[in-house]
Amino acid sequence: MCIRDRPGAVKVKVLLAQALFGNPDILLLDEPTNHLDLDAISWLEEFLINFENTVIVVSHDRYFLNKVCTNIADMDYGKIQLYAGNYDFWYESSQLIVRQMKEANKKKEEKIKELQEFIQRFSANASKSKQATSRKRALEKIQLDEIRPSSRKYPYIDFRPEREIGNDVLFVEGISKTIDGVKVLDNISFTVNHDDKIAFVGGNELAKTTMFKILAGELEPDEGSYKWGVTTSQSYFPKDNTTIFDTDELIVDWLTQYSEIKDATYVRGFLGRMLFAGEDGVKKMRVLSGGEKVRVLLSRMMIMGSNVLMFDEPTDHLDMESITALNNGMIKFPGVILFACRDHQVVQTTANRIIEFLPNGSMIDKITTYDEYLESDEMARKRQVYSMSEDDENDN
């Protein structure tokens, strides 16, 4: 099979192998974590940490940048500013600088007002004329710091369920599915509770996407069943949105069909939150960029007001500001979330339960955070047992 026909993750791995071959003096990486699963990203992090030569990397993955980078080059305000430290240090430092400039300007403005009031009051007073003149000179010396508007724009992502979710959310019983002769799901069973935010993890990308498609009603299982609770309403963010955007329909018209309020101004409000300004709402669906498509789908999820959200790789094509906004929206959401995501920080800060889909189609289910899951010896032993059982089946 030609490289062009391979999945995105395989293409990235081939490009990485090409870049890493020969131990280069300078390694240039432009979004190297795109399409890689969390295990592959973890391997890349460790490799780059131990790489002795220079690395220049562009990435939207905050956790990756924190692990790998020793310096951050901030491209904003029409210039580049270099910071020593990782991503979190840069973020805190850059925010602190802006806050300090604003506070300094505020004090200067207060001083300007005080001087202007004195000058206006006493400039015609002969006994105070020298003081007024002195204050005029002081006023002329005060210069406000120029705070240029940042090129960074943060969307406003706020998922508000219209109905509170009940105790019975989702029951999955014995689901199996074979695709192209490979059993990607093998007797999968789990129950979702009303306070769950579950991350689907593991290198079996097809298993995760297949599970989402089944739960969204887009695919029938070969065996088993699932049942949503009567109080639930679901919104689904698909990994592949090709068919959704294969239309000449306008964004605002397409989005209106998912809104109970059939008012263009109301719908445009949701688009505005997602940085679609002015006439952007009358763009045709098929001409949108990858990032715009993601923001339209997130607008749909907000406007639907569901109490169960399902995300299959929502951070693909998003910039760091949008990922941060999505992360915050997921954390604040009071309903249930089922999601797969390659962004370590999104998984760690959102999930309170981990379901790992293994290569043999089985799963591991654990109520824990993602970092605790990775550090757990118990989970490592379980993965080894499943891996050994898969090897035995292959030998037979």
Positions of PLM-derived features:
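Short, polar/charged, Gly/Pro-enriched helix-capping and turn/loop motifs at alpha-helix termini
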Residues: 104, 126-129, 146-149, 153, ...
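Short, flexible cytosolic linker that couples an ABC transmembrane/permease module to its adjacent nucleotide-binding
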Residues: 148-164
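ABC ATP-binding cassette signature C-motif
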Residues: 4-105, 159-396
